[in-house]
Amino acid sequence: MDGIVPDIAVGTKRGSDELFSTCVSNGPFIMSSSASAANGNDSKKFKGDNRSAGVPSRVIHVRKLPSDVTEGEVISLGLPFGKVTNLLMLKGKNQAFIEMNTEEAANTMVNYYTSVAPVLRGQPIYIQFSNHKELKTDSSPNQARAQAALQAVNSVQSGNLALAASAAAVDAGMAMAGQSPVLRIIVENLFYPVTLDVLHQIFSKFGTVLKIITFTKNNQFQALLQYADPVSAQHAKLSLDGQNIYNACCTLRIDFSKLTSLNVKYNNDKSRDYTRPDLPSGDSQPSLDQTMAAAFGAPGIMSASPYAGAGFPPTFAIPQAAGLSVPNVHGALAPLAIPSAAAAAAASRIAIPGLAGAGNSVLLVSNLNPERVTPQSLFILFGVYGDVQRVKILFNKKENALVQMADGSQAQLAMSHLNGHKLHGKSVRITLSKHQSVQLPREGQEDQGLTKDYGSSPLHRFKKPGSKNFQNIFPPSATLHLSNIPPSVSEDDLKSLFSSNGGVVKGFKFFQKDRKMALIQMGSVEEAVQALIELHNHDLGENHHLRVSFSKSTI
């Protein structure tokens, strides 16, 4: 039989390298002390399961594992799909068996990895159903590490923080992973704000985050993040390394830190010890929390991906996943069963599944200039960051307005970029509204044109999923990007146009390779904001309407 496990009961004498102490067709896979040789390098013949068809089972056979793989890494393969109830490592064979809590979870796992090849330590691995319906392990020394790892992981996954924080669980996790619970995080292509609260929102889906320190080094935004245990750190690294927080930017590069613990002295927008809420802020500057925490750490943000919080690679095909239900991971919010088109559209905005914006899409905008603000001006300004659906200026409090975006992620972008900027001479304040939608006035209700529905507006910038406009979203700046300029319009024409409403034009430059585009620099950010509101979609003739957006460049 050359060491292949047969599908019939056998009663022949077994050698020391035989894997099973009991072998029954489709019965439990029983690991005993006689299997010790299979964990070493002297066992040559074991080839795992002999199968011709992938009959679903709770037990999954993993092959071609890297020789230095850890128990934690193998367990992490199954975590996004449900609870891992047992593990058998055959390191000498570069194989493992994972037992899931349900056949459904195992089936989802195998289906997923059939379409997206799993990789551990840069090496492709292979996953298939086992012939065996369950794993039964004994108390042999070879199983001690696997069981300790399982206990540590499951204690965190089930929310049993007391057990997870116990010395035994932490020690077992350290021995299992051989790694620090501290991660070093570098964010590349930082086009949008990434704050301490953004990181906490993302990384807390994989375990209990104890401390975070953020800093800038070599002109790169970096962070150190400490988990309660190395298992969570391992899981987060495997799931998030190389992923983009937002589409096509803010790429996470994650490594283990040489530090085993962080020393946080202050709780502010740069550092946080979640176990010590009593720590001082350490400076007199207002914390970014006031403007950012509501945006990115808001409760109720849900995933537009059916694999909520699972941290799948960006290669995962969203349409294939629509409607699937996968058990939550580390308290991740409930997955949504949504149409594939909606899933694909949402995925084009936010790259990490657990951060996609199906949360509150309505913003409360206050401290407006009641003499000058109009629904149209708010539509154009907020439309730089998403597709505005409705705007309502409050009838009895015209310094306040509600702006409804297409989804929660767009609302968060608009809030993070516009909060505190001046509009019509006043610094606007923006928060998430308690309302879930903006109501249109009833027929006959006095409104004075203060409520507008823009749901079908042709001026939406982000109608097409994956549009390049998603990659050109920048905070308000004095420099504006102009496009769709006809050949007959000159530099002087545009300078005259932008100074006609009292603004000062400080600089202008056509793009060398494309005179349909240009940069124009106004006297201040406030002037640029006003110019964008007044001149976006301005008719330049020849069937050309000017497109205006904020630029990250200067002249």
Swiss-Prot record:
InterPro entries cross-referenced by the UniProt entry: HnRNP-L/PTB (IPR006536), Nucleotide-bd_a/b_plait_sf (IPR012677), PTBP1-like_RRM2 (IPR021790), PTBP1_RRM1 (IPR035000), PTBP1_RRM3 (IPR035001), RBD_domain_sf (IPR035979), RRM_dom (IPR000504)
SMART domains in alphabetical order: RRM
Subcellular location per the Swiss-Prot or TrEMBL entry: Nucleus
PROSITE patterns the record matches: RRM
Transmembrane segments: none
Keyword RNA-binding in record: yes
Name of protein: Polypyrimidine tract-binding protein 1
This protein's encoding gene: Ptbp1
